[in-house]
């Protein structure tokens, strides 16, 4: 490689589509993609083909589409536990509405300072 040449690595981050069960704090609950979620993922990538590899969380809502994408483009797939969603502890499986009814203002506190207002039993944001 010439001194003036620089090798560039581009990383595309794609968030999963809608999981089965609607909007809720899912964290590490392993819900698969809904039909709408599959359509969202396919629409997001279209016929884009520059990837040399696909790396994904092990959670179904990510891994199933990653497997499809890697097979479609004949590139290697790596599933990596470290890419799993942050654990939301006591909030897992709950909707924002449920949390606000039980603890008014709790989400505003969390969004203002997620380190100080971490859900009970949740993975600390600083460790995530």
Regions found by a protein language model. Give the residues of each.
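Short, mixed-charge, low-aromatic patches
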Residues: 1-2, 20-25, 56-58, 83-94
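Active-site-proximal alpha-helix that buttresses catalytic centers in soluble enzyme cores
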Residues: 9-75, 79, 102, 126
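Acidic, low-complexity terminal tails and accessory targeting/binding regions
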Residues: 1-10, 44-47, 86-98
């Amino acid at each position: 490689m010439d001194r003036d040449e620089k090798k560039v690595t581009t990383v595309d981050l794609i968030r999963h589509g809608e999981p089965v069960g609607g909007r809720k704090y899912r964290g590490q609950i392993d819900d698969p993609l809904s039909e709408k979620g599959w359509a969202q993922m396919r629409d997001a990538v279209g016929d884009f083909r520059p990837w040399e590899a696909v790396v994904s969380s092990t959670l179904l809502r990510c891994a199933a589409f990653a497997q499809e994408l890697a097979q479609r483009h004949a590139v290697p797939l790596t599933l990596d536990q470290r890419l799993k969603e942050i654990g939301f502890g006591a909030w897992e499986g709950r909707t924002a509405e449920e949390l606000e009814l039980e603890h008014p203002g709790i989400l505003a506190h969390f969004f203002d300072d997620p380190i100080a207002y971490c859900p009970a039993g949740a993975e600390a944001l600083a460790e995530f």
